[in-house]
Amino acid sequence: MKEVKEALFMNKGEGESSYAQNSSFTQTVTSMTMPVLENAVETLFSKDFHLLQALNAVDLGCAAGPTTFTVISTIKRMMEKKCRELNCQTLELQVYLNDLPGNDFNTLFKGLPSKVVGNKCEEVSCYVVGVPGSFHGRLFPRNSLHLVHSCYSVHWLTQAPKGLTSKEGLALNKGKIYISKTSPPVVREAYLSQFHEDFTMFLNSRSQEVVPNGCMVLILRGRLSSDPSDMGSCFTWELLAVAIAELVSQGLIDEDKLDTFNVPSYFPSLEEVKDIVERNGSFTIDHMEGFELDSPEMQENDKWVRGEKFATVARAFTEPIISNQFGHEIMDKLYEKFTHIVVSDFEAKIPKITSIILVLSKIVG
């Protein structure tokens, strides 16, 4: 089995279950939060960043959907607006698109709109380059980044939480793949501890790369509840665990594979995020809020259409990490079972999806 950093990516290509074809919700979240990104660019210009010849920005965990193009276009448009207002010199925008090496960079760059890049723009020339690697470590030289953006990436962990096996070698989260109502407290504690460790590494790395007064706009999956096992946080993973368990009962998957697998992801609360940032001490929190949105599949009246769409979207971002543990050959059967479970057990209501948006400024000194 591959390590997390080798297996964690969204479904590749442009097929029916690809991330490129199933990232509309992420795009919606990005569009909703664009005013925050626009304000961040405004703030940078108020701090005399327009005196620079080039502004360096990065989209961390960019994946391969159209979301990152919206980010680039927004930054470029705001820079052009501020250049006109301030009558400043022609600026250059350098954008780095980062994700783990397994990301589908080919599809990403094939889809890059020509109007976004090039050097013939009247006010802002834009250059885009891919940067494969883990954002939990250093990616860029010291004091080289002015603006950092990330959408739906920071909640992914570097590994499954440590300490989920007893001294006797027994699985402590047996039959589950994430935190659930039946998980013992040690599972919840292990997940929070792993997120604390990884998010701290993320902040430490960015604190060296971001210039003083530079800005980060981070959007991640999270929760409004203090309970990490609330259905809004664990819905997809809970249903996938049920589907996997059914295949175990049919002898198609080894039970040990289910009992020893824990998803490397954690949806934190606002309080947990705030505590980690404040403990780190490298950034000030300029803005932080949580908001809920209905899953787009809830707009469908037919329960089978709703279930199939939800399963297809879920497959786009869960299949690579799930197939790494359970095998590619079982995936079609697994997600077919998953669809049936969504329809039969949860046809009334798919929980709202909670996001956290966080704006951080690098402390001077």
From Swiss-Prot:
It comes from Camellia sinensis. The record marks 149, 221, 265, 313, 328 as: Involved in substrate discrimination. Pathway: Alkaloid biosynthesis. GO terms for molecular function: caffeine synthase activity; metal ion binding. May be involved in the biosynthesis of caffeine. Catalyzes the conversion of 7-methylxanthine (7mX) to theobromine and of theobromine to caffeine. Has 1-N-methylation activity. Caffeine binds at residues 26, 152, 155-156, 221, 317. S-adenosyl-L-homocysteine binds at residues 19, 62, 99-100, 134-135. Its EC number is 2.1.1.160. Pfam families: Methyltransf_7. It is an enzyme of class 2 (transferase). Signal peptide: none annotated. It comes from the Eukaryota. Binds 1 Mg(2+) ion per subunit. It catalyses: 7-methylxanthine + S-adenosyl-L-methionine = theobromine + S-adenosyl-L-homocysteine + H(+); theobromine + S-adenosyl-L-methionine = caffeine + S-adenosyl-L-homocysteine + H(+); 1,7-dimethylxanthine + S-adenosyl-L-methionine = caffeine + S-adenosyl-L-homocysteine + H(+). Belongs to the methyltransferase superfamily. Type-7 methyltransferase family. Its cofactor is Mg(2+). InterPro entries: MeTrfase_7, MeTrfase_capping, SAM-dependent_MTases_sf. Keywords: Alkaloid metabolism, Magnesium, Metal-binding, Methyltransferase, S-adenosyl-L-methionine, Transferase. This is Probable caffeine synthase 2. Mg(2+) binds at residues 173, 259, 261-262. GO terms for biological process: alkaloid metabolic process; methylation.
